């Protein structure tokens, strides 16, 4: 592997590495010190504490007044881009990620509130092909188009949460200055076409106890996936699924304990994964849940227990908790 002489020299000089990063951090501090940005970040603190957006004027103006979001973003780029060019081995001073044509830079994270600058590449969106499903997350979301354009749809759903949904579509053209506000788990937006790139400034706030995120098939509204709306539970669900794929039977007792607390959706997933890894351990916790009449999962747990006993009578011999 070829390593440039500049990079080789930098690897041998930790002080120079720190200086590069300090230079970029100085650009970040300069942007944060701008009056409009400082007021916006002050309001972010109040927004994260539960204040309505209308009660946070500096923040509200960014997502309602024409040109403010572009001005804030241009101010950031005016500080950050020269610093990154002059210190091209430094990392951006904000958390960032890039995957499948979607780049996200997190400008602020305060409690359950996130302020992010996002960029979607049209070529990558085209390569994915036509969307077959749409996800609805329980969060308040405000977006301003900073640059680029796109054809999109606002998607609204009605019907039962755990069954087929009726999906209604409203076409929208996203152009610089366009503003979208989406609140709650019953509406979202779907980008269909981006000629080049779409740059968006996004503000999100997740409730303290969010509803599960739900994914529906676009063609008929069938529910195809449901996951916890809580970040910690969502990460735990991914870990449970990974343990299941790995066949980690030794994790079954841990999953059994996880099945006793948390949201109903999370607990049900823990029961299923526990059953798949260790039928006896899973059946014990399933029985425990089914016998607790105060438990909101008692009825579905009892129904599943009856089905399993019908198919696998030998489970009747499993010693279950009192």
Regions inferred by a protein language model and the residue ranges of each:
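Alpha-helix N-cap/helix-start positions at coil->helix boundaries
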Residues: 232-233, 249, 263-268, 295-296
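A short, N-terminal "cap"/entry segment at the start of jelly-roll beta-barrel domains
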Residues: 9-115, 218
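Short, conserved beta-strand element in jelly-roll/cupin
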Residues: 137-152, 156
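A short hydrophobic beta-strand segment most commonly corresponding to one strand
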Residues: 141-142, 179, 193-213
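Amphipathic alpha-helical scaffolding segments comprising HEAT/armadillo-like alpha-solenoid repeats
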Residues: 218-224, 248-259, 279-290, 313-320
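Conserved short histidine dyad/triad with adjacent acidic residue
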Residues: 117-137, 173-175, 182-185
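Short acidic-glycine-tyrosine-enriched beta hairpin
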Residues: 142, 157-189
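Structural detector for internal amphipathic alpha-helices that build alpha-solenoid repeat scaffolds
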Residues: 236-245, 268-277, 299-310
């Amino acid at each position: 592997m070829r390593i440039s002489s500049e990079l080789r020299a930098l690897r041998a000089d930790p002080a120079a590495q720190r200086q590069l990063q300090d230079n970029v951090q100085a650009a970040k501090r300069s942007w944060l010190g701008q009056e409009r940005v400082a007021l916006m970040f002050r309001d972010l603190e109040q927004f994260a504490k539960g204040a309505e957006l209308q009660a946070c004027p500096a923040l509200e103006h960014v997502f309602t007044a024409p040109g403010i979001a572009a001005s804030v973003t241009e101010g950031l780029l005016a500080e950050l881009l020269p610093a990154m060019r002059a210190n091209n081995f430094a990392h951006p001073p904000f958390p960032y990620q890039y995957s499948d044509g979607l780049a996200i830079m997190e400008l602020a994270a305060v409690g359950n509130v996130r302020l992010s600058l996002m960029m979607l590449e049209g070529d990558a969106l085209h390569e994915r092909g036509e969307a077959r499903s749409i996800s609805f997350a329980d969060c308040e979301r405000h977006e301003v188009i900073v640059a680029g354009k796109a054809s999109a749809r606002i998607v609204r759903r009605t019907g039962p949460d755990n069954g087929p949904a009726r999906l209604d579509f409203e076409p929208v053209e996203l152009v610089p200055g366009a503003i979208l506000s989406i609140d709650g788990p019953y509406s979202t937006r779907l980008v269909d076409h981006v000629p080049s790139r779409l740059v968006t400034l996004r503000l999100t706030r997740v409730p303290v106890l969010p509803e599960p995120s739900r994914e529906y098939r676009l063609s008929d509204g069938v529910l195809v996936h449901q996951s916890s709306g809580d970040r910690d539970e969502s990460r735990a669900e991914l870990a449970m699924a990974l343990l299941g794929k790995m066949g980690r039977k030794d994790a079954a007792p841990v999953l059994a304990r996880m099945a006793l607390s948390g949201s109903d959706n999370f607990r049900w997933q823990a029961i299923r994964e526990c059953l798949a890894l260790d039928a006896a351990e899973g059946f014990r916790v399933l029985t425990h849940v089914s016998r607790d009449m105060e438990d909101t999962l008692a009825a579905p747990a009892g129904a599943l227990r009856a089905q399993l006993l019908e198919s696998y009578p030998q489970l009747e011999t499993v010693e279950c908790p009192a």
